[in-house]
Design a protein with these regions (language model features):
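Short, small-residue-enriched loops and turns at beta-alpha junctions
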Residues: 111, 139-141, 165-167, 192-196, ...
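Primarily NTPase-proximal linker/entry elements flanking Walker-type ATP/GTP-binding cores
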Residues: 8-136, 143-163, 170-190
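Short, glycine/polar-rich helix-capping loops at beta-to-alpha or helix-loop-helix junctions
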Residues: 141-147, 228-231
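Generic start-of-chain signal for non-secretory N-termini
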Residues: 1-9
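Conserved phosphate-handling catalytic cores of large alpha/beta enzymes
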Residues: 171-172, 179, 183, 195, ...
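Catalytic cores of large soluble enzymes that bind and process phosphate-bearing ligands
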Residues: 1, 26, 66, 70, ...
Length: 323
């Protein structure tokens, strides 16, 4: 993932770090190139504009441009703003004070929601937590069958509706049943649609009102690019989401969805990324590691360390003069 954007940013960074003196025009040129690179990566314009504005405000000025290592300082600023754009520090899904913790999975049909529900269950099981998977997509018998197969493979209990066909009641009954057992986490696999519609949102709203999940996670295909962020915004405005899981990241060479979602949804973080079809192919979304990978790993991190060291030396010199 991010291959194309990584190549473009690497070239821009080499230009910046190779100049001993930077002018406002040099920073503006770099920002124009970054803008083009992000557009080509299918990043949403509503995410690009504030990002570039923040970088320019911090990267242009006497303090940075007259520092010992202006190019390195600007690289560090871009790095920090990219981390912020991606949502900052990863926060693990917490458990509720009392059992069970209820997680609602929402998203469009075909995003990989059912498989992702299984991946989450495996993640919790590996940490010693008992899970209950709830097949609430009554419109697709294949989804119910798939979740039962996943539960069998993981040796995780799957709730059996026993003839109930109302998805709201299925979720309510499942949570009630889990409350009488030592179930730590209940994962609700709700219905999807091929596109956003009022009926889907109304059903999800009712489930949320009746069940009161502790986490509502939106699952979306990363291959959709910036459109994934727009759909996430629609779901957030309609039902309120707490975070996003991006699937099929192993096939997304551009990374537009990952770079757009936090900004477009008003701060809803990408929590996890799916990197394959196997049930262990779910990774926490660490923004700093993603940016490190995006910007050339060790090379950029060494630049940032140099910039921080240079800044510390300058501050020390100023302090010594005052003394």
């Amino acid at each position: 993932m991010f291959e194309n954007l990584s190549d473009r940013l690497g070239t821009i960074y080499k230009k910046l770090k190779g100049r001993g003196v930077l002018k406002d025009a040099d920073v503006d040129e770099a920002l124009r190139e970054i803008r083009i690179a992000m557009i080509e990566a299918d990043v949403s314009l509503s995410a690009i504009k504030p990002f570039l504005k923040d970088v320019r405000e911090k990267g242009v000025g006497q303090k940075v441009l007259k520092s010992l290592t202006p190019g390195h300082q600007v690289v560090k600023i871009i790095n920090d703003e990219l981390v912020s754009l991606l949502g900052g520090e990863f926060k693990e899904l917490g458990l509720a004070p009392s059992l069970p913790t209820v997680i609602l999975m929402a998203g469009l049909q075909g995003a990989g929601k059912t498989t992702t529900a299984g991946k989450l269950a495996k993640r919790f099981k590996d940490k010693g937590k008992n899970c209950l998977l709830v097949p609430a997509d009554v419109y697709r018998p294949a989804a119910i069958k798939q979740l039962n197969l996943i539960g069998r493979d993981l040796e995780v209990e799957v709730y059996q509706a026993e003839g109930e066909t109302n998805p709201v009641k299925i979720c309510q009954n499942a949570v009630e049943a889990a409350s009488g057992k030592m179930i730590h986490v209940v994962i609700l696999d709700t219905a999807g649609r091929l596109q956003v519609d009022e009926e889907l949102m109304a059903e999800l709203k009712t489930i949320k009102e009746k069940v009161q999940p502790h986490q509502s996670l939106f699952v979306v295909d990363a291959m959709m690019g910036q459109h994934a962020a727009e759909v996430a915004r629609t779901f957030n405005e309609a039902i309120g989401i707490d975070g996003v899981i991006l699937t099929k990241m192993d096939g997304d060479a551009r990374g537009g969805a990952a770079l757009s979602i936090n900004s477009v949804t008003g701060g809803k973080p990408v929590c996890f990324i799916g990197t394959g079809e196997k049930l262990d192919a779910l990774e926490p979304f660490h923004a700093e590691r993603i940016v490190s990978r995006l910007l050339g790993k060790g090379d950029v991190m060494s630049l940032i360390e140099k910039a921080e060291t240079a800044y510390d030396l300058e501050e020390q010199a100023k302090l010594e003069k005052k003394i």
